[in-house]
Amino acid sequence: SLLEGLDSWIVEQVSSIPEENRVIVSKHKAMEYYGDAFGFETVSLLDFLGDSSSLRPENISSTLNMLKEENVKAIFPEQIPASKLLRNLSRQSSVPLASNQIFVDGLMMDGNMVSVAVHNTCTIVDSLGGSCDKESGSNLESEWYKLSD
C-alpha cells in the first residue's frame, strides 16, 4: 500500500543519517511519535526551558549544555522565521536552525499527510547529515494525489 511505501521510504532516508546525529530538537513534543517510529532521540525545548513566562538563565544554561552534550546538529523550527527564542539558542549554542520548518500539530502546509511526511523527513534528513531522495518522495506524493482524485 501507499502508506507502507511511505514508511519504507522514510526508513531508507533515515538510514543515510549517521546514528550519532539522530536527535530531533524542536520546541514542542510533537515530534516524539515520529522519533519513536524511526529511531530518533527527540528533545522538546519546552521541557528544558519551561514556558516563556518562566524563562530563567539557569534553564537556558542547562539547555545550552544539553545541546552540546547531545552533539545536536540542528534545531528544527515549527515556523519561519524561527521564534526569537530558537534564534537566540541557535546563536548561543552554535547549533544551526534547519533551513525549513517542520510541520506539526495540524500546522499543515498546503497538502496532505504524505506531503507533510515527505517534507518533514527531507528537512530532518538533510539537516542531520543524511541525503534525502526528494524525487522518490515526490513520486509518493503523486501516488497520493491520484488516489484522492
Located regions from the model:
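Extracytoplasmic metal-acquisition and chelation regions
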Residues: 1-149
